[in-house]
Amino acid sequence: MNPLTKVKLINELNEREVQLGVAEKVSWHSEYKHSAWIFVGGLPYELTEGDIICVFSQYGEIVNINLVRDKKTGKSKGFCFLCYEDQRSTVLAVDNFNGIKIKGRTIRVDHVSNYRAPQESEDVDDVTRELQEKGCGVKTPPSSPPEVSEDEDAKLTKKHKKDKKEKKKRKKEKTEGQAQAEQPSCSRSATVKEKKDERASRKHSSKTSERAQKSEHRESKKSHSGSPDGRSSYHARAEDPECKARKEKPKHEHKSASRREAEEKSRERERGRSSGTHSGRHRGHSDGRSHRSRSRSRSPDKSHRHKKYRHSRERDSYHGSDRRHH
């Protein structure tokens, strides 16, 4: 089959897989998953191994290359075999490099299922021998630990010591927690009972104090209500506007100036009214007392006059009877 037709067929397969969204496991590339070698044909004769590595190393690290040459002349025959470090690089190389042109020639790239490296012969050059033995992959130097300065080393040691101390503290806390958890249940129940007893005693004492306060308050109310002095003092306290003002002061400290002025005016009015009521009561008591004293003073005069009148009538009647007898 013509190599160009092979290139077209491979490209058509790749396009169909992309359109259908075929998974990697079902793709035709999965048949060559055990081989990391690819075939490259249609190369210009002027290219060397280095040129080919520069082009094909875009999709992975190349481990080995075998550019086929003529044994007599040593010229390349236009095709080679490449081995990648990672097998997935072969899929990328086949999909992307197949059908490209290098120096006006279209190249063909395809998988190789079972490739055997050529055996050593006397005609092989020293360069090809080294490539076949060592490969063309770049050997990375062993990673040496970075140099650490003295300050950094001291900081690291301090951090290490701090970490050790923190670990020891955590271990101690864990051991203490385990020891507390291993305590007998009776000790826990005893502590719980003690706490409950303390709470109950506090509640009982608070209740008894509240009851005593309530009883004292009731007795004081009864004593005030039973005695007239207590009543009068109670009414006086209730009517006293100054006491009300004192009680209302802390509650209404946040009021505005206008409200305070209105309150002062109302207090003055209440004071005037209370003074008027007290004076009226005092006058009423004084008038009642004077009226009683007058009535008492008048009553003995009336009785004395009545006695004199009776005594004069008795005399007149006695003298009249004497005259009749004579």
UniProtKB/Swiss-Prot annotation:
Compositional bias (Polar residues): 177-190
Keyword Nucleus in annotation: yes
Chief location: nucleus
Region (Disordered): 117-326
Pfam families named among the record's database cross-references: RRM_1 (PF00076)
Biased composition annotated in UniProt, kind: Basic residues: 157-172, 291-312
GO biological process, one term: mRNA splicing, via spliceosome
Disulfide bonds: none
Phosphoserine: residues bearing it: S149, S274
Subcellular location: Nucleus
InterPro entries found in the cross-reference section: Nucleotide-bd_a/b_plait_sf, RBD_domain_sf, RNA_proc/Spliceosome_comp, RRM_dom, RRM_Ist3-like
Keywords in alphabetical order: Isopeptide bond, mRNA processing, mRNA splicing, Nucleus, Phosphoprotein, RNA-binding, Spliceosome, Ubl conjugation
SUPFAM superfamilies xrefs: RNA-binding domain, RBD (SSF54928)
GO CC terms in record: endoplasmic reticulum; nuclear membrane; nucleolus; nucleus; U2-type precatalytic spliceosome
Gene3D superfamilies attached to this UniProt entry: 3.30.70.330
An MF annotation (GO) of this entry: RNA binding
Biased composition annotated in UniProt, kind: Basic and acidic residues: 191-200, 207-219, 236-245, 255-273, 313-326
Job of this protein: Involved in pre-mRNA splicing as component of the activated spliceosome. As a component of the minor spliceosome, involved in the splicing of U12-type introns in pre-mRNAs.
Protein name in UniProt: RNA-binding motif protein, X-linked 2
Gene: Rbmx2
